[in-house]
Amino acid sequence: IMNQLQHSKKIARKLRAHRIFGGIKPLALKTRSLRSRIMPAPIPEILILPLLQHQGSPAAEIVNVGDQVLKYQLLAAGESALSVPVHAPTSGKIAAITDTPVPGHDEQSQRCIHLRTDGVDEAIDLLPLPDHRALSHWQLLERVNAAGICGLGGAGFPTTEKLRSGIERGIELLIINAAECEPYISADEALIRERAAAVVSGAEILQSICLADRCVIAIEQNKYDAVNQLRHFLESSS
């Protein structure tokens, strides 16, 4: 990836971006949100897990009220291409499976699993992936689907379908969007600052799935700490 970044810098020098006149350029107000490190959120007594957390059809529950479940255990299976599975965020007991009001959804309520947490946070053993290069891109795609990953944008498309369309169309350049134009949101910058190795590893896995020739991490110039962390990791691992 280091060689690809250097190659992309040479290309960028040859390209001249045209200014867009007008519009709004708000101040970056991220100082407060970046003062502390990434911390785990406290586990509440009840977790409400919608079965439709994505664009498409809802997942179908495979657990029953009263079942004791472990962290990462599959609770609802995706039954179509536009459906992703739902897993337990922590251990506990299934308290209810019922229609529940959900913010930001077109309908007033949707089917949800209510998980009463036990505070133990006991987890199942996850299937390790020591070297993603040992798997084909289709096998990696299946791992992404089984993990229940979907986009965090407004549409919430299943990540598997995004990647599948890229494979079918053919991709030369994979762009990892780490640019944050919103004045306060700082999740991308915080993630890169603290976990640059994981970001690069994830980019390499996506590149293997998409069969892309090159990969570029797009990040704004004012994200100095994040850029330095990426450079340090790439230079030390090359």
At which residue positions do the language-model features occur?
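N-terminal, Lys/Arg-enriched amphipathic/low-complexity engagement segments
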Residues: 2-62, 114
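Short boundary/loop segments of OB/S1/cold-shock single-stranded nucleic-acid-binding domains
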Residues: 8-11, 77-83
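N-terminal glycine-rich anion-binding loops that anchor highly charged ligand groups
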Residues: 38-46, 63-70, 169, 174-179, ...
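Short, conserved secondary-structure segments in the cores of folded domains
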Residues: 59, 65, 82-85
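Short, well-structured beta-strand-loop connectors
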Residues: 64-77, 96
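Iron-sulfur-associated redox domains of electron-transfer enzymes in respiratory
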Residues: 82-238
